[in-house]
């Protein structure tokens, strides 16, 4: 789970069952197909707007009032179509997000609340902290952002191939002279868009890669703080009886201090990244015009062609700059998916340990018609290996009463956990 590729693959292994689960797959594939179809529609509308942009500025340059009025009605049709498509796409996307989240939450809860694993998880897998927060918050972030990323990547790919052809045709050729070598570069604006987006993406990754770890740490600290508040509420009576308010306040103050430290680390990373992204945002509307300006000044294209070319360049550059625009969200998503995957890996370890043959494991056999509770060669040890009970032999008959006595920490409660089959 150390690379984005392995993180995506691990999360897909955990969460992709939604598209094959009985009772879910038909709706899942219908919603997915709807998103793809609406993505194609939106790109078609964007191409329609690009053509309208050319015609409008050409008519404006010619002061053709009749054509301008006609184009106003065309614009109304474009805006109306775009509004309907975006609204439907939003509805489909949100339904897919909530359905996927509900399925993954139910699967995780079922694995967590089975055979005492919710107890064993805290005892045997201490690195998996706050499973409740992972189920409630991290699954939500993982599924919602995954759907958003899938939608935006699809939109980028469709828009890229659509407007690459438009930009290639509009670019023409540019004569290049390097020393004594002269040649014509076809589709020069396409290469400019690719270079611009590639440089921006590399700089974004270099400045923002630390955000993934910072986001993971911050979410862990947020979960620790929530867990501390929940524990104080659940043990309110005991805290009051022991006059433990001061200790609880100190514990919560420490959690809040750790949260602030993690927040500050994340803020510094986001600040460094924003220096680049804000600069690129200011340059975004200007660079396409500068790149297309030589053809306009050379009289090869009219004003409408200049604006159409600039818009096509912006569309290609936007498609290639997905990482620049989404890196902060990607860092947040990566941190949440890691936490969800680690929870499932820990549950898998517990399931495999329960199924694997082990002579040292406590085996509980339930006999409904027996009047005896038998313990044979029962040994109970702490997770660190310290023995609490060694080879206990006990026979308890119905309705005998038994008192288990011993010092605190001697294993009285642990014996009951062993009998219940959760140790």
Question: Which residue ranges define each predicted feature?
Answer:
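Short intracellular "coupling" helices and adjacent cytoplasmic loop segments at the cytosolic face
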Residues: 63-66, 98, 108-135, 227-251, ...
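Cytosolic ends of transmembrane helices, especially the final helix of ABC transmembrane type-1 domains
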Residues: 212, 223-225, 240-244, 250, ...
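Membrane-integrated ABC transporters
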Residues: 1-46, 55-75, 89-93, 97, ...
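Loop segments that connect adjacent transmembrane helices in multi-pass transporters
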Residues: 210, 214-267, 355-359
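A hydrophobic transmembrane-helix motif
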Residues: 34-37, 41, 48-50, 81-84, ...
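ABC-type nucleotide-binding domain
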Residues: 357-423
């Amino acid at each position: 789970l150390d690379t984005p590729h392995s993180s995506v693959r691990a999360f897909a292994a955990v969460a992709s069952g939604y598209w094959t689960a009985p009772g879910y797959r038909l709706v899942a594939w219908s919603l997915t197909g709807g998103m793809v179809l609406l993505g194609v529609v939106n790109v078609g509308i964007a191409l329609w707007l690009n053509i309208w942009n050319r015609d409008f500025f050409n008519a404006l340059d010619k002061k053709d009032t009749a054509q301008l009025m006609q184009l106003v009605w065309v614009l109304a049709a474009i805006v109306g179509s775009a509004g309907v498509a975006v609204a439907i796409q939003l509805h489909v996307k949100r339904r897919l997000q909530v359905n996927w989240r509900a399925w993954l939450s139910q699967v995780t809860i079922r694995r967590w609340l089975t055979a005492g694993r919710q107890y064993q998880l805290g005892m045997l897998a201490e690195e998996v902290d706050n499973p409740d927060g992972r189920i409630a918050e991290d699954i939500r972030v993982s599924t919602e952002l995954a759907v958003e990323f899938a939608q935006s990547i699809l939109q980028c790919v469709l828009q890229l191939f659509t407007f690459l052809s438009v930009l290639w045709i509009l670019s023409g050729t540019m004569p290049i002279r390097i020393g004594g070598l002269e040649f014509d570069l076809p589709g020069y604006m396409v290469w400019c868009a690719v270079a611009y987006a590639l440089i921006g993406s590399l700089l974004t990754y270099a400045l923002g890669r630390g955000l993934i770890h910072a986001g993971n740490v911050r979410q862990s600290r947020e979960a620790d703080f929530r867990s501390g508040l929940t524990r104080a509420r659940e043990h309110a009576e005991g805290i009051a009886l022991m006059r433990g308010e001061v200790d609880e306040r100190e514990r919560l103050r420490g959690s809040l201090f750790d949260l602030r430290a993690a927040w500050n680390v994340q803020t510094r990373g986001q600040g460094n990244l924003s220096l680049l992204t804000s600069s690129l945002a200011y340059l975004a509307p200007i660079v396409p015009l500068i790149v297309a300006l030589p053809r306009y000044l050379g009289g090869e294209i009219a004003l409408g062609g200049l604006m159409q070319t600039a818009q096509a360049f912006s569309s290609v550059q936007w498609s290639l700059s997905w990482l620049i625009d989404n890196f902060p969200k990607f860092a947040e998503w990566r941190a949440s998916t890691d936490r969800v995957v680690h929870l499932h890996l820990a549950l898998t370890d517990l399931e495999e340990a329960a199924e694997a043959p082990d002579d040292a494991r406590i085996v509980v056999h339930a006999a409904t018609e027996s009047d005896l509770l038998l313990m044979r060669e029962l040994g109970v040890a702490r997770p660190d290996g310290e023995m609490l009970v060694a080879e206990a032999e006990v026979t308890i008959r119905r309705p005998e009463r038994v008192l288990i006595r011993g010092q605190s920490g001697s294993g009285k409660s642990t014996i009951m956990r062993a009998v219940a089959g959760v140790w």
